[in-house]
């Protein structure tokens, strides 16, 4: 059994990660660290786990007793922890924050998008889980980058559920504001754009276009629905074949020949992609569950690869659908 520890156990991504690991046939959770909830039952915070676990939050960190450590911490906290603690050299680490997503000589974390870096993830000890918007958008663009087709600016509109803002209440996550409402935030300046550009340049070294990304807040709890518009003269049939070939060995990305919607992916680790051609413009529609494929599900996917397991173990999940 893989012995797992979690640091930062009270948020939405941690709750989903705990749910996945409890039901994973090859994992035993040894501890869930939360300084604000130490001594409380997991079900005091994650009430959806009633009847599934008797685990209790702890403020202890028995790092020598585990094989893999997940960070579900606020941005900046993972780096602080790594800089201030003596972490066992053979301990595998999966960081769900943005601290190590950008390549640097200062760290050895691999960017954890399996559809881009599968082989490197399999041989890595340290993996930086991608952002939720970044995952959804990259999966819609990677096949184009591989074929060197991203030569003009890319227009992206993407709407996310309220869980994307985290568990801590705020003015824009309050029900009376969010319900029956929509708004944009961080237009052209979202923090996920640099990691998207980094990945596209990895496949298409000449990539130097702008990503004009407008994020939207949706009035639903979970999911990301993104539309990407790219100028492209290649015929639709050939483009569909490019996407199918690119994702042929990937279990969680599916090219669909008709319109897609969030209910087909919410509660799963899937990404669905639909393509349409309008003159010289290619419309790519990509949708995921922000808490699973965009966070905790992808983290478990990375863990499976790092421990040489079949990649879908513990991740065969039914979508909400209706």
From Swiss-Prot:
Keyword GTP-binding: no
GO BP terms in the entry: L-arginine biosynthetic process
Keyword NADP in record: yes
Recorded metabolic or biological pathway in which this protein acts: Amino-acid biosynthesis; L-arginine biosynthesis; N(2)-acetyl-L-ornithine from L-glutamate: step 3/4
One GO MF term attached to the UniProt entry: N-acetyl-gamma-glutamyl-phosphate reductase activity
InterPro entries: AGPR_AS, AGPR_type-1, NAD(P)-bd_dom_sf, NAGSA_dehydrogenase, Semialdehyde_DH_NAD-bd
Main localization (coarse): cytoplasm
Keywords for the protein's UniProt record, in alphabetical order: Amino-acid biosynthesis, Arginine biosynthesis, Cytoplasm, NADP, Oxidoreductase
GO cellular component, one term: cytoplasm
Catalysis performed (reactions): N-acetyl-L-glutamate 5-semialdehyde + phosphate + NADP(+) = N-acetyl-L-glutamyl 5-phosphate + NADPH + H(+)
Subcellular location: Cytoplasm
SMART domains: Semialdhyde_dh
E.C. number: 1.2.1.38
Enzyme active site: 132
Function: Catalyzes the NADPH-dependent reduction of N-acetyl-5-glutamyl phosphate to yield N-acetyl-L-glutamate 5-semialdehyde.
Family, similarity comment: Belongs to the NAGSA dehydrogenase family. Type 1 subfamily.
Name the record gives this protein: N-acetyl-gamma-glutamyl-phosphate reductase
Species classification: Bacteria, Pseudomonadati, Bacteroidota, Bacteroidia, Bacteroidales
